[in-house]
Structure formats: C-alpha cells, structure tokens
C-alpha cells in the first residue's frame, strides 16, 4: 500500500509491505511463516544510499508492536504526553517523529508472536530458545535482504529489552554465518549479561546494579532526605553509582564478615540513597530486592511503584503483601491500546486479511530454552564484542531510561565496562539517557529527544 507522512516539515512518500516470509529447509520444506511490516521510502533508486533497519522487541514472546507503533514507524499510538493512555477508543496518528526520513524499516515478529507461526505447531518449540531464535531471525534477515535486493544498503538492527540480547548475538551471527556486516546496532533498554539483573542467592551483583535506579526513583517521588533531594537527577544517580561501585560493592562481597559498625554505616547510606527505612534495610541484610522495593518505597502512602517505569504508581490492594502484586507501569490499558491499534492498523490501513489472532505478548514461547547456558547466566556481551572487533566500523547506540527497574542503567554501564572492548573501538559506543522507563519513548519528551539523537547517530 502507498502512503505519505510529514516529518520535520517534509512530506515523505513511502510504500508499506505487510505479509509473511516463509522460512524453509534446504529441501524446500516449509519451517515457518514469519510476519513482517516493512516501510520503504519512495524515490530512492540506489539501495546503497538508503539505510535499512530491522526492528524487534523482546519478551521473549513479544511482537514488534512497541517499537513499531511507539517510536519508529510512520504511525504511532496517541497517548498523553506523560505516557499514560487516553480513554478508549484508542487511535493512531501520523508520527512526525518517525525515523522513516533516516532509514527504511522492517518490523519482525519472531515465530509464535504477531501473525508468525511455525509450519507445524507441534514443532513450534523448535523456535523457542536463545539459539533457535537467533538462527530463525537471522535467516529472516538474510532472506529479506536477498529477496528485496538490499545487500548493498547500510544495515542496522534495533532491539528492545530481550530484543537487545537478540540483536547483540545476531550481529555476530550475521557476520559469521552469512558474511553480512552491519553498520550499527541500537539497544533500547539493554540486557546483555543476565547476571546483572537476576536476584538469586549467591549473586550480589544486582543489588549494586539496581541502586542508582533506586536512587533515581526515590528522587522522583521526593522520598530522599535533604540535601540530596534538592540536587539534580544526574547528580543523585552519580552519587549512587560511586557508592555502588565502592563501599556498597565491598560490603556485599564481605557478607557476614562485616562488623556491626560497618553494617550500621552502610545501612544509613543505603537508606539515604533509596528512600527505605533503617529497619527495612537492616531486615534485607543490605540487599533490597526489586519486587520488594517497588512495594516498600511508598508503602506509607498506600502506593506501589512501577517496575517498567518507576514514575508510575498504583494503589496497594494487599497492605501486608511483601511483593508487588502488579506493575502499575505495565497496566493492561497500555497493552490494550497497542493491541487495539495494531489490529485496526493492519486490517484497515495495510489491508491484512487473516483469521489468526495477533499475539502482542504471548506465553506460548515458554518455557524458553536456555540449555546453551545451563548452570551459568546468559551473557551475549562477548558476542557483541566479537562483532565489533571483527567489524571495526560497527557502531553501537544504547538508549537508557533513568526510571527503568527492569533493565537498570548501571547494569548496562557495568556490562559495557566489562566487555574488554579494545580502546580504539570504545568511541563506537554511544550511551544516551532519558527521564522515563523501559519504554522511554512513551514519554513525549523522550520520544522527541530519541529522534534528535537518531538524526545525529545516523549521520
């Protein structure tokens, strides 16, 4: 279908292609039908002059709808400027902050998400795992580039959340398997090393990784003591970083060997940076867990805070509950408005006809197969480093939300500072920060800033 959108005051004419690309075995037997939506700017005859970006979300089990209708595509879900949903009926508007003026885009729904399905549902589990997912999405990218004659185009990947795990490994996979060298990888709310965010006995790392985001959250809700509360967000986060990588990390490592005086000192400092009480920090042995923190910070106000975006709050319905019962930043209305809009958009504007339900976020992919990393944490950082070393021109842009308690900023910074990227290549990594959460682009201020940052990065 043919369309037009105005971006930065310029009319952009484009072609939208929505459909399935069939993955096959070498003998031609069908393996899966992968659904995608592609946008190609009209008037460009030489593909070498026009970038091509492949986009996907995470989960595992998520379709590509969030990046598609939230930030990148030529149409976006209309929301309040603060990122909250409007009442139904939900609707789309032209996205004047779309990236279509910078790059053609292909939104991929991995097998079992969106309208993508395995050829034989009994074999769908063959696609539901870390390695299987990289292989199938990689095969889609290779096939699309070949079928649509885009091998000479500058090529990029953009993933969000688990999609950053996929994108990091995929960059290495595309190079090693197909000789496809990318120009860039964009990681939105990154998780490359799962040890940084899995709260488990014997793993003290996440407590330090989450502390700066705890501090940002407490600052936002005015739960910090003075004079810290009067300082800027960036200054508060930096003080929390310094404490987390110094005294706090040392205290966590010493464990039960800490003296009573040191415990009291660290308790006071953790309290001062998190907004929690002395007694609560003491009860946690200096280790507040994310799901408890969300329930505890504003308990006296009767509020639970969001994990995906800690600016959001909701009522605590079980006052004695130790853990958050639900995430107010992942409210059903957000999923509902995106689900409504993608179904309406595909059928009415892109003329897609199917009897299949569009799986926005499905549990059908679980249990996800991590058998490649039994008895260890999944860590794709070495694969991204390998891609960068093999391809010294590969650039990486990491977008972070200050209020993201799902993939906290310091965990990402820690991961990149422990990747052993050669000094000559470190300039290829760009970090940007936004005053919002996991899907930072839902906040209009961040949506606008992301587009400005994208214009600089794609230059």
Regions from the PLM with identified roles:
Residues 149-162:
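Alpha/beta-hydrolase fold nucleophile elbow
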Residues 74-78, 175-273:
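A catalytic-pocket lid/entrance helix-loop region that shapes and gates access to the active site
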């Amino acid at each position: 279908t043919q369309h037009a959108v105005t971006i930065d005051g310029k009319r952009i004419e484009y072609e939208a292609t929505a459909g399935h690309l069939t993955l096959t075995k070498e003998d031609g037997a069908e393996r899966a039908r992968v659904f995608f939506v592609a946008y190609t700017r009209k008037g460009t005859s030489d593909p070498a002059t026009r970038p091509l970006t492949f986009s996907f979300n995470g989960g595992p089990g998520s379709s590509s709808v969030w990046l598609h209708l939230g930030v990148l595509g030529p149409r976006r879900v209309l929301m309040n400027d603060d990122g909250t949903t409007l009442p139904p009926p939900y609707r789309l508007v032209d996205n004047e902050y779309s990236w279509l003026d910078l790059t053609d885009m292909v939104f991929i729904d991995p097998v079992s998400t969106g309208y993508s399905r395995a050829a034989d549902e009994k074999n769908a589990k063959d696609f539901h795992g870390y390695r299987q997912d990289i292989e199938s999405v990689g095969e889609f990218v290779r096939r699309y580039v070949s079928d649509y004659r885009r091998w000479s185009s500058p090529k990029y990947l953009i993933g969000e959340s688990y999609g950053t795990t996929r994108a990091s490994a995929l960059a290495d996979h595309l190079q090693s398997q197909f000789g496809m060298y990318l120009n860039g990888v964009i990681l939105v709310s990154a998780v490359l090393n799962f040890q940084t965010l899995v709260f488990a006995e014997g793993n003290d790392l996440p407590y330090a990784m989450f502390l700066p985001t705890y501090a940002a959250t407490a600052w936002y809700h005015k739960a910090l003591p003075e004079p810290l509360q009067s300082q800027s967000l960036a200054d508060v986060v930096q003080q929390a970083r310094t404490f987390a990588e110094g005294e706090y990390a040392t205290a966590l490592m010493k464990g039960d060997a800490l003296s009573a005086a040191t415990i009291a000192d660290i308790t006071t400092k953790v309290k001062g940076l998190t907004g929690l009480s002395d007694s609560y920090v003491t009860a946690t042995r200096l280790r507040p867990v994310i799901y408890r923190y969300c329930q505890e910070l504003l308990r006296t106000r009767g509020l639970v805070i969001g994990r995906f975006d800690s600016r959001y709050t909701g009522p605590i319905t079980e006052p004695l509950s130790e853990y958050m019962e639900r995430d107010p930043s992942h409210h059903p209305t957000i999923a509902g408005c995106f689900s409504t809009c993608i179904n309406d958009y595909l059928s009415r504007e892109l003329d897609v006809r199917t009897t299949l339900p569009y799986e926005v976020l499905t549990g059908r992919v679980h249990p996800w197969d991590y058998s490649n990393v039994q008895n260890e944490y999944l860590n794709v950082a070495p694969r991204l480093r390998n891609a960068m070393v093999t391809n010294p021109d590969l650039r990486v842009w990491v977008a972070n939300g200050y209020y993201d308690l799902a993939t906290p900023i310091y965990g990402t910074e820690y991961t990149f500072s422990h990747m052993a990227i050669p000094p000559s290549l470190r300039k290829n990594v760009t970090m940007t920060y936004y005053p919002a959460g996991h899907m930072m682009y839902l906040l209009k201020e961040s949506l606008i800033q992301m587009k400005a940052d994208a214009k600089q990065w794609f230059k």
